[in-house]
Amino acid sequence: MAKKVKIEDLLRPDNFNFDMVQVLSPEGKVVNKDLLPDLSDEELVQLMEDMVWSRILHERSTALNRQGRLGFYAPTFGQEASQLGSVAALKPEDYILPGYRDVPQLIKHGLPLHKAFLWSRGHVEGNNYPADFNAYPPQIIIGAQYVQAMGVALGLKKNGKDAVAVTWTGDGGSSQGDFYEGINFAGAYKAPAIFFIQNNGWAISTPRSLQSAAPTLAQKAVAAGIP
């Protein structure tokens, strides 16, 4: 009779214990001074202004959508810090491949505001980006941008470019097949890609607890060999 093997006993313990890296508490207090970024007062003020701008953009876009004046809009409420903080670290040479909820990053990366609204209304010019703007239009298919980001990153590597490709998805996107394909190939080819999961706890109406048994979504990168 075959003996049962406890797979968990064969895995390294740290694969199952990802400690949360935290700089600020929910109340805004510093909990780890060693991780504080070296930012000037002016840079901190700019980041705060960007987040307030994103909240106002969300509120006005939501109002336009409910009035029937804006065709498609995915709310960004509550994700200002993750969206604007991550895009603030990028260079103009870096490529961003957004999902449909990542319009604020596109605008802060250099997309003219009216282009974002043309895209939301389904106008063809909303996908006509300037030649020197390193980004792609928002991906409507959840998680599909992960495969595309891997391809762009691999192209940057092959061409010797000092740049990265960045993409975002939610916790629901991390359950999609394209997500796994993207991180698998990126790990195999060591592509300069940054995969950002914005875990708000829900995939439309499906809670995080029903999407994955993994204690943390970061663990999904272990099998792909991504740090």
Enumerate the language-model features and the residues they cover:
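A short, structure-level motif marking secondary-structure boundaries and short turns
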Residues: 33, 166-168, 201-204
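Cofactor-binding active-site loop characterized by glycine-rich and histidine/acidic residues
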Residues: 56-59, 63-189, 207-214, 218-225
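Structural beta-strand/beta-sheet cores of well-ordered domains, especially the beta-sheet scaffolds
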Residues: 19, 94, 191-193, 200, ...
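A short, conserved beta-to-alpha structural element at the edge of catalytic cores
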Residues: 189-209
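A structural signal for isolated positions on well-ordered beta-strands in alpha/beta enzyme cores
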Residues: 22, 166, 194-195
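A short, flexible beta-alpha/helix-coil linker loop
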Residues: 29-30, 103, 200-203
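N-terminal amphipathic, basic-rich helices that act as targeting or association modules
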Residues: 1-96, 100
